[in-house]
């Protein structure tokens, strides 16, 4: 009916808005690292003023709270990507998949807000930060986690499509065709992330060789 159609019409804009707000939060944390804002506890514990810019930026996800924020940013990014590039999808399937994706994001957002706030403050702020774990000061930190997360989180899109298809009662060859590009993209990102991580672990002596 008309009510259902209006709810379906809201799914795309809501997904875009969710991504926008989460991306702003991620940009704010990145800016705190780049500008060495040590009033943010996360920055004070994982960065310092003399650190090269690459490791200041990579330090954003070199800790528990920041890596969770990166995870949720990528989760919202995939939902936004479906909004932009999924115009050929049946409206009902698309809106349900976006709703499932949004609910997953809400779960992670609640976890961050309740247990892992990356914006916890330090008063008064220290003059300098503690710096990053020396083993993480490596180009691998800049590339391995983002690719790995693009792979891990990308598969949530396949899950969302699966739940949407079950709700619609249309798990068929057409559904498999619609979900294939998103699954392949996640698989490629995850493969790249594992290769980069294996290479990083191989030449980092303390980690004892290849990791899979």
Tell what function each PLM region has.
Residues 1-212:
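Polytopic transmembrane helical bundles with strong interfacial aromatic enrichment
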